[in-house]
Amino acid sequence: MKIINILFCLFLLLLNSCNSNDNDTLKNNAQQTKSRGKRDLTQKEATPEKPKSKEELLREKLSEDQKTHLDWLKEALGNDGEFDKFLGYDESKIKSALNHIKSELDKCTGDNSEQQKSTFKQTVQGFFSGGNIDNFANNAVSNCNNGGS
């Protein structure tokens, strides 16, 4: 019976010593929880920023005239995915195409300028439905002239 009492006392002492360490463990867990919360906040703050579209990235690199003609081209190509395909081309080729559009539209003056611009828009639509941007300046030409008709 004495042995059982001694073992029981040793067991209680051992159990008591484990509880004293648990207080430190609880403090550490609380600190870890706080630091984990801070880490989660920094991750949440970083995620709301959504990536920019190809069009937005391109617009940052264009002049005001080029942006205007990009809008014109977007309207001309419509929602058939041709505009998205256009945005996939090299930036220098896109700028060259936009400058070509500007020069062709600037030629459209006079009484029939709106009709000439509409015809050029149809020409551009037809070109991008099957053409490659490399030949754009040669194949997408307006019937406009400087004098108008």
From Swiss-Prot:
**Covalently attached lipid (N-palmitoyl cysteine), positions:** C18
**What membrane topology is given?**
Lipid-anchor
Please note every region of biased composition (Basic and acidic residues).
38-58
| InterPro entries noted in UniProt | Mlp (IPR004983)
* Subcellular location(s) per record: Cell outer membrane
Q: Which Pfam families match?
A: Mlp
As recorded in UniProt, coiled-coil segments are none
Q: Where is the lipid attached (S-diacylglycerol cysteine)?
A: C18
Example of a GO cellular component annotation carried by this entry: cell outer membrane
Q: What is its main location?
A: membrane
Per the entry, what induces it?
Answer: Strongly induced when grown at 35 degrees Celsius.
According to the record, the residues making up region (Disordered) are 26-58
Which UniProt keywords are listed? Cell outer membrane, Lipoprotein, Membrane, Palmitate, Plasmid, Signal
- Signal sequence region: 1-17
Q: Which family does it belong to?
A: Belongs to the Multicopy lipoprotein (Mlp) family.
Q: What does this protein do?
A: An outer membrane protein that may participate in pathogenesis. Some human Lyme disease patients have antibodies against this protein. The Mlp proteins probably undergo intragenic recombination, generating new alleles.
What is the name of this protein?
Lipoprotein MlpF
Origin species = Borreliella burgdorferi (strain ATCC 35210 / DSM 4680 / CIP 102532 / B31)
